[in-house]
A protein has these predicted regions:
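Glycan-recognition and catalytic cores of secretory/periplasmic carbohydrate-active enzymes
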Residues: 2-396
Length: 396
């Protein structure tokens, strides 16, 4: 594995990012602690207006709790606590202690909701556990959902930080079940459609790459904690599946060849059908989410990095990892260029790969941190001139 060599200008930038991270982390911890009766991760804040969102807002208000955000919040708090514990900042020890206390409270709060609902967490719920009017897909008891995926990896990270073997085993059982459902096509998306331009509700015969992509983050985490080679094998199977069915390459010989004139090497589409062929909307639109493609490159490279850190790769996997990294680095650059708006405002949410044009004007915030993560991993393996480009992203 290549050693990290950072130019001085980037080291200075990283120090700035660390200050920003500490400030934002303190902000979120303070919001969690200021209302002991609430005890959920509180993201109900308008960064533009610098005001709290009205509680009665049916989508963004404090009375609408998102299971995804609570699970992801657990994972983020635990990960940042580990980062703080590895540093030498004078306030870090106190901050880690605060975060551990808050994590315990959050786990207890979520366990209370699980017990009251007599099922796992759901995509949306009110503070009292009742279902909002905008509630998404009804839980199917025998199927795992995205909320299970986010919560299981969040609980695993939190339990590892707290050295709580009982909670970790509980998280592991749920995460393993999620992976089994993904690999056997039993996984069901529970996301509610809050925007008609974002078609997230399940459609019979349509299959997205999202479950495998998000699972890669959990597999990286479980590898770090357990060193179990089984998670390495599952991750390789998931990456191979995505490359085979969702990414265009020059030697494809399946039904996608009929679209070859419109497609470019590295294009990644969102959905396939029951025959593993690209899902065309209205018979003519092949949807790409550049942010999701960028997210996949970052999560895949992070997974491969942790496999190497643990020395878990056999010779065949090492060869595949080297080949995949070349493709992933190309895909990162390709989708930043494909999705980036001409006026430099952001990355489009949806691109039609046939017409090579945006499907609408939405540009969400989250592709930016996904690009930063992917660039951080890609810079280890790319030519010098490309590393300069990645450094430029970090310096921005």
């Amino acid at each position: 594995m290549k050693p990290i060599s950072l130019p001085s200008r980037l080291c200075h930038s990283i120090q700035s990012w660390e200050r920003v991270t500490r400030s934002q982390l303190d902000f979120m911890v303070h919001r969690f602690e200021k209302d002991p009766a609430y005890q959920f991760i509180d993201t109900k804040y308008d960064l533009i207006q610098q005001t709290n969102v009205t509680k009665t807002d049916p989508v963004r208000g404090r009375n609408t709790i998102y299971g995804w955000i609570q699970g992801r919040g657990l994972e983020a708090l635990a990960g940042h606590a580990q980062w703080l514990a590895s540093g030498n900042h004078p306030d870090d020890t106190k901050s880690v202690s605060r975060i551990k206390t808050d994590i315990r409270l959050l786990i207890n709060r979520l366990d209370q909701r699980i017990a009251e609902q007599k099922c796992n967490l759901t995509f949306m719920m009110h503070e009292d556990g009742s279902k909002p009017a905008l509630f998404g897909v009804e839980r199917v008891a025998e199927n795992c959902h995205f909320t299970d995926l986010f919560y299981s990896k969040g609980l695993a990270a939190a339990a590892a930080l707290l050295e709580d073997s009982e909670q970790f085993e509980r998280a592991k059982v749920l995460f393993d079940r999620v992976c089994d459902d993904i690999l056997t096509d039993q996984f069901v998306s529970d996301q509610a459609s809050l925007d008609p331009k974002n078609p997230v509700k399940p459609v019979p015969g349509r299959h997205g790459h999202g479950p495998r992509m998000i699972a890669l983050g959990g597999l990286s985490l479980m590898l770090q904690i357990t060193g179990d080679t089984r998670y390495c094998e599952i991750g390789f199977e998931m990456i191979e599946h995505i490359f085979k069915h969702y990414v265009h390459h020059s030697n494809r010989h399946d039904a996608i060849s009929s679209l070859a004139q419109q497609l470019q090497v590295g294009d990644m589409w969102e959905f396939i059908d029951d025959k593993s062929e690209p899902w065309l909307e209205a018979g003519r639109v092949l949807r790409c989410d550049p942010g999701h493609a960028i997210e996949f490159t970052g999560l895949a490279m992070k997974f491969l990095h942790h496999c190497e850190q643990r020395n878990l790769l056999n010779s065949s996997q090492t060869t595949s990892a080297q080949q995949w990294r070349h493709t992933l680095c190309h895909m990162l650059q390709h989708h930043v260029q494909l999705g980036f708006s001409a006026d430099g405002i952001g990355i489009y949410k949806a691109i039609d790969l046939i017409q090579r044009t945006p499907l609408h004007s939405d540009m969400p915030w989250w592709p930016l941190p996904e690009t930063i993560r992917a660039a951080a991993f890609a810079r280890r393996y790319c030519p010098a001139e490309e590393v300069d480009c990645y450094d430029a992203i970090m310096l921005k």
